[in-house]
Regions:
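Extended, composition-driven regions rather than compact fold-specific motifs
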Residues: 1-266
């Protein structure tokens, strides 16, 4: 059975500052965070996730939790909103330990707290992270893989592709909100990249890419699958692979990053 999350041996709350922000496409931005405290981060690559703490609009300082375990949630919730930061889960896109920097990529959309922060952030602004480990686990018996996600899963999938053997047959299905957010990148030799945008088809998040997976010719097995994004996309891909393709449940990692119509509490 593939473990859902692999945590590092030790974790700490890490306070950093914004070094740079760059818009990659109209709907995607990259924020570089840095600082000497990054020496406490154990970089594992793949889909390594962190809790990102960032100030609410109007807060001049960042008040981080002080406990380096899951009790941080209770510690955060007792803070009044006047000093409580926002927190969201993101993937480390790149890590440069020698420079004391990490890059985090964001899908920027609508009037959401995270998107608004990305739009207004400037160098020197505070931010913090807490390591949440990795969930990608390629079994030794896998002879190919399938990666599926919407725009919220794109940074994780790109990071996974950075670390796989170039010869591993990989079918990669990526959905973004608009064609303007499709971008070129250097993929491993064994990977085939399939882009889809919702402005060319069904506007429901995940519907276009899920239908594409159902119609696709996949690599011969045994297969490993990793899928994430809107909750119904992740569960739909898993159900299809298990029921229609015969992929064992233990060889599928799936994660509902968000649910349509439901906001993340803060």
């Amino acid at each position: 059975m593939i473990p859902k999350v692999s945590l590092p041996a030790s974790r700490r709350m890490i306070t950093l500052e914004v070094r740079r922000r760059e818009f990659l496409t109209p709907g995607f931005a990259c924020v570089t965070l840095g600082g000497p405290a990054l020496r406490d981060l154990i970089v594992t690559g793949n889909d390594q996730a962190v809790r990102l703490f960032f100030p609410r609009e109007g807060q001049s300082a960042l008040r981080m939790p002080t406990v380096a375990n899951e009790a941080w949630i209770a510690q955060l919730l007792v803070l009044p909103k006047a000093v409580r930061p926002w927190v969201r889960t993101l993937t480390i896109r790149r890590a440069r330990p020698a420079d004391g920097e990490i890059d985090i990529e964001f899908a920027v959309h609508g009037d959401a707290p995270l998107s608004n922060w990305v739009r207004r952030v400037r160098p020197g602004d505070p931010a913090g992270i807490f390591d949440m480990g990795t969930m990608y686990r390629l079994p030794e018996h896998a002879r190919g893989q399938v990666l599926v996600g919407d725009e919220t899963a794109l940074p994780a999938i790109l990071s996974i592709l950075d670390g796989i053997p170039p010869s591993l047959p990989s079918e990669v299905f990526l959905e973004v909100a608009a064609a303007a957010d499709i971008r070129s990148f250097e993929a491993p030799a064994g990977s085939r990249i399939h882009w889809f945008s919702r402005d060319d088809g069904d506007p429901r998040p995940g519907a276009v890419v899920l239908e594409a997976v159902r119609r696709a010719a996949l690599p011969p097995g045994p297969l490993y699958a990793w899928t994430a994004g809107e909750s119904r996309l992740a569960t739909g891909v898993r159900r299809h692979l298990v029921d229609d393709r015969g992929v064992p449940k233990r060889d599928i990692s799936f994660f509902g990053y968000w649910r349509l119509g439901r906001s993340t509490p803060g």
